[in-house]
């Protein structure tokens, strides 16, 4: 890409297991673009199989950024993600590149695309400990009471984001929803959505692949290294494997529960992304999905001069 062209950004989003990573690599190879992750769990080191983190071999094909940024014991907020992503995007654009932002964490993507701003409130370990002692169901009920918009947006089982929203409220006295402000970037952005009418089958296939690739062993290693009370171990997939290791789920029930919870999460993602009318959708099952994506990008580049 010539440096005289304007900076821009391509976003590839959609529900989990739709095939974003493989399509992103194919697009990036054709465009010479770097891939920037927009996944809230890929920022953590050692959480690999259960997060479907691109493998080392995949990462060698195309430069990947915004992964393995911090220790799993650290708190990493959307604001922290912005602090990493915004200057990185600018640096890549200044080098004449067209970055490809890829992921399914809607709030991360919205933070970049809409320029959402977040309160810089430091983690409060004592407050978090007190809230955790109440249990996730009560914490989420409290969030629904003090900040209904955030309560609707944050999944009932998402302990990390529930605690963060409550932390912001109790420390600042303001609702997280009210504190968010939008300052959209000046450069043009193309958002491409990837979805499939066979998503359930894809979820089942990927779950089985994770389990045969050593997911249970990964979780056991994480428990041994960080302790079974690590908040990230209470997230999708890891929570179910922990239950299996503790004896409350059988081997046959394990994949069933992972698939069930993943389907619910995918439904939530679809609702989030489908609410954005600016996203242009591609069928993940279409044989020409790469050509379709490249066509959208080419038309975007011509119209915007990027």
Swiss-Prot record:
It catalyses: adenosine(37) in tRNA + dimethylallyl diphosphate = N(6)-dimethylallyladenosine(37) in tRNA + diphosphate. The keyword Cell inner membrane does not apply. ATP binds at residues 14-21. It comes from the Bacteria. The keyword DNA-binding does not apply. Its EC number is 2.5.1.75. It holds the Pfam family IPPT. It is an enzyme of class 2 (transferase). Residues 39-42 are annotated as: Interaction with substrate tRNA. Substrate binds at residues 16-21. Its cofactor is Mg(2+). InterPro entries: Dimethylallyltransferase (IPR039657), IPT (IPR018022), P-loop_NTPase (IPR027417). The record marks 105 as: Interaction with substrate tRNA. GO terms for biological process: tRNA modification. Keywords: ATP-binding, Magnesium, Nucleotide-binding, Transferase, tRNA processing. GO terms for molecular function: ATP binding; tRNA dimethylallyltransferase activity. Belongs to the IPP transferase family. NCBIfam families: miaA. Catalyzes the transfer of a dimethylallyl group onto the adenine at position 37 in tRNAs that read codons beginning with uridine, leading to the formation of N6-(dimethylallyl)adenosine (i(6)A). Monomer. HAMAP family: IPP_trans. This is tRNA dimethylallyltransferase.
